[in-house]
Amino acid sequence: MSNAITMGIFWHLIGAASAACFYAPFKKVKKWSWETMWSVGGIVSWIILPWAISALLLPNFWAYYSSFSLSTLLPVFLFGAMWGIGNINYGLTMRYLGMSMGIGIAIGITLIVGTLMTPIINGNFDVLISTEGGRMTLLGVLVALIGVGIVTRAGQLKERKMGIKAEEFNLKKGLVLAVMCGIFSAGMSFAMNAAKPMYEAAAALGVDPLYVALPSYVVIMGGGAIINLGFCFIRLAKVKDLSLKVDFSLEKPLIIHNVLLSALGGLMWYLQFFFYAWGHARIPAQYDYISWMLHMSFYVLCGGIVGLVLKEWNNAGRRPVTVLSLGCVVIIVAANIVGIGMAN
């Protein structure tokens, strides 16, 4: 396995670790509605950081974006909005299926759809079937899916042992939402694929290869921001128990505390795709669709590890932890299989 591929896998791991940890600061926010907290974090992660970093990278910010036709920018934006819809459905999936089953089904579907639909859209799916390296990477995707399934099973065993149940368990409604969440969340993968002309334009301006994907986030995350922030603002305006004014009428130190923690959560959310861009830049072009598989499977891996570190599994018993460990090992094996396949 080449050093470039190894580093690509490593940066995807770092990005996924940030994704697995990003919600920790949000849990420390006090006396704010979820909608206010999520909006503040989202403004940082989907608007401020993409714009600020792009302004630093590009020699002429406005000239860069105005150089693209609507036919180039619109798919990128709409796929970003598609991801935003999936993101909203994510919480509802947890509500009706419970954390473990909801995450397992949603992540499993978005892993498959986001990984395999990209080469199909690009018309090079035959690379997966007709070449040794392609077949090896396809095997890695399958093994990763098995790993996600094992980790999901571990979560179910943990919830059963600890008496944790879904807020309003409804299998039919939950499955529909999980499938929708999985498909729509893959919009981020499609958006990045559609943004390739933006990568090329950034490279032509002298932007370092590690950073060429970052300017596209202004458009991608802009689409997602409209959906997420729109959802939050509508709820803040219509739901009687929610009030932005009340949330910002608390004691000043508490407001500052909440803003800083929400901003930190937003920063950590953004960093997952900052390092995704670094990892993606190291992956061979013919296997660039594998970036999504690496990110999603490592997200599940890191989520399990973070749960162990935070002692969330302490009262779960030995069997769930053993199953979780097995799932993590399978995901690591999958990453190595994919790496070997790309090297071939």
Curated annotation (Swiss-Prot):
It is a multi-pass membrane protein. Keywords: Cell inner membrane, Cell membrane, Membrane, Sugar transport, Symport, Transmembrane, Transmembrane helix, Transport. Its main location: membrane. One of its GO terms (molecular function) is rhamnose transmembrane transporter activity. Signal peptide: none annotated. This is L-rhamnose-proton symporter. It catalyses: L-rhamnopyranose(in) + H(+)(in) = L-rhamnopyranose(out) + H(+)(out). It is found in: Cell inner membrane. The chain crosses the membrane at residues 4-24, 38-58, 68-88, 101-121, 137-157, 175-195, 214-234, 259-279, 290-310, 323-343. The gene is rhaT. It comes from the Bacteria. HAMAP family: RhaT. Belongs to the L-rhamnose transporter (TC 2.A.7.6) family. GO terms for cellular component: plasma membrane. Uptake of L-rhamnose across the cytoplasmic membrane with the concomitant transport of protons into the cell (symport system). NCBIfam families: PRK13499.1-1, PRK13499.1-3, RhaT. InterPro entries: L-rhamnose-proton_sym_RhaT.
